Amino acid sequence: MTHDSTFRLNGMVRLLHEGVHSERPPHDRLADPFPADHAAGSALWNGLPEAAFTIPGTSTACPYLEQFFTAPVSQTGNTPETASVPAPVYLCGSATSSMDVARALAAHGQLPVWGSVLALSQRSGRGQLGRNWVSPEGNVYAALRLPRSHPFTGTAAAPAVGGLIAEALTHMGFDVHMKWPNDLLRREEQEEGPGWCKVGGILLEERPLPPHRETPAENLLVAGIGLNLVSSPPAALMRAQRAVPAGLLSSATKSNVSPLSVAGLWMRLVSRIFFCYVEEIDAKGKNAWRSLAERHLAFLGQTVLLTDGPDEQERHTGILEGLDDFGGLRLRNRKGTNSFLSGSLRLDRPPMQP
């Protein structure tokens, strides 16, 4: 990883140096202790300013060390991008999952909306339908708390979040598309010609939170986000019915995007997601999310196969026309155009050669 010198940071980072335990008996450990010296030399933090860990201790239900970044004024006349993180970013060591840590923090009133957790690695990471997510060090394993407002409160939530993330990554220089409803793909040259590979995934979970002090009980909505930066699951661990092979977000030999530390990339991504939400969705009205998601929708205009039901026995083939207002996939065939709210999507045949 290289030093994150191409952009500046504004925001608060909190290191969970003593680890995190569940709020309920038997208080299982959710994240291992992550001392400052360990964190500073880890893939999670490598490349960011060393001064970030000359920080005071803070005593809370989930103790952390805190650093507030203020982007310095440029003395050279250059104006690098400033990543302004809208809420605290928590860094933790090896965890059961970043989503577990996020729920524990939220239960203690320590994770506001747009706050996030970034784990060094995961022991029990999970993907769609509860599938195990391979989680060694060096990749992004994050959880982001979302507002419980449109479009995140209904069936459009998954493609809306996917569109936001794809838009943010594209702005950062990564050519990423969303495979409905919650996979992140990029194009890749393969032996048989141009193809797709999966570089990340998104999992949404909404669960009730217990009341905290004066705060009434509420539901917690969290997006689990995984991105393959340095490693991807081997083919033997991928399910047989996978739509595309696994791959990396970028390759040093095939991309002009400068590599970032894991934490640096995540902070920049959160900054872009929040900016995009405010400018592209919140400010433009009810269905603005749909235009954004369709802009990055993989397989658009191509013949696809949608499978659903037990053992994926239900099969629907058609031209992918886009999304409906509820986040459903719109397929057109000789019988007309229909919308589907669930299923696994793949190309029905290889894409045409250019």
Q: What are the roles of these predicted feature ranges?
A:
Residues M1-G163, E167, G193:
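N-terminal lobe of the biotin/lipoate ligase/transferase fold
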